[in-house]
Amino acid sequence: MTGTTLAATYGPISGADLEAELAQPRIADGDAQDAAVYERDGGAHAPPDGDRADVRRAAGAGDASVRLTRVSKRYGERAVLADVDLSIGRGSFVSIVGRSGCGKSTLLRLVAELETPSAGTLVKRGDGGGALDTRIMYQEARLLPWKTVLQNVMLGLGRRAKDDARAVLDEVGLLARANDWPAQLSGGQRQRVALARALVHRPQLLLLDEPLGALDALTRIEMHALIERLWREHRFTALLVTHDVQEAVALADRVLLIEAGRIAFDQRVPLDRPRARASAAFAALEDRVLQRVLTGSDAAPAAPNAAGPEGASRGRAAPASGLRWAV
């Protein structure tokens, strides 16, 4: 059976990934070739096995730091990002919003080092200036369908990591499904497994590329609470790309808007956690960000104490409850 045939059967895993998996030599421990498939897509430059334990220990002692200086990205003649300057504080949660094609996911891929800048510099520093373990979650869970839930979480770690994998499955509420197949899970449960697979490595930086975009509204809210709880417990740095402005405000300390390849808006979110979505302060801040995305101007009233002096009202905006998506 070819990788193309398997891709048609199993969907989210691309044909190229499966071809790579099938081309690997079969050895006693099948985790090695499966891990190669995972590391290329979701491992985002994971360290070699021998270094992984040291990185996990460092992650427990410090947080991630990312700095971009005049970073640009071009594909041929088309400029996607232009002169981006961005500093992401250690342990912070940053959301990126913007219209389709503005460069959000390209920026995330640059931070993941899945692509390289055309110009400028990108620096990632772990604790004490050491290596920075980075993991990435996509909209598709990208689970290997021939592996159980537990085996998917253990990819790249070997059988000695079973206790760690079971512990993180317990954290995401899926320990009872450890021996099930991915096909037996709902979409939200598959994303929980993908989250567990990232967190078992104890990353210092977690990149989220619209991971909840395909889920229903109630499941999204449950996942928001889970991601926030785990972020607060593990204190990794999080960078989220999303089309959903409400999601961005609910999760982040800071919301960035990308327009025409540049950071056009940088909004702090000083609301208490957990966020009360029905509160006037939350609604006003969400509305301000959304109006900035839609109109290109800061027309909405700011939440009290949320935006500083620049948040003064300059016009009447549509209710935030009626508009959420920046597409």
Curated annotation (Swiss-Prot):
InterPro entries (UniProt xref): AAA+_ATPase, ABC_transporter-like_ATP-bd, ABC_transporter-like_CS, ABC_transporter_ATP-bind, P-loop_NTPase
Domain named ABC transporter: residues: 66-285
Positions that bind ATP: G98, R99, S100, G101, C102, G103, K104, S105
GO cellular component, one term: plasma membrane
Record localization: Cell inner membrane
UniProt main location, coarse: membrane
Disulfide bond sites: none
UniProt topology in membrane: Peripheral membrane protein
Similarity-based family: Belongs to the ABC transporter superfamily. Aliphatic sulfonates importer (TC 3.A.1.17.2) family.
Protein name: Aliphatic sulfonates import ATP-binding protein SsuB
Gene name for this UniProt entry: ssuB
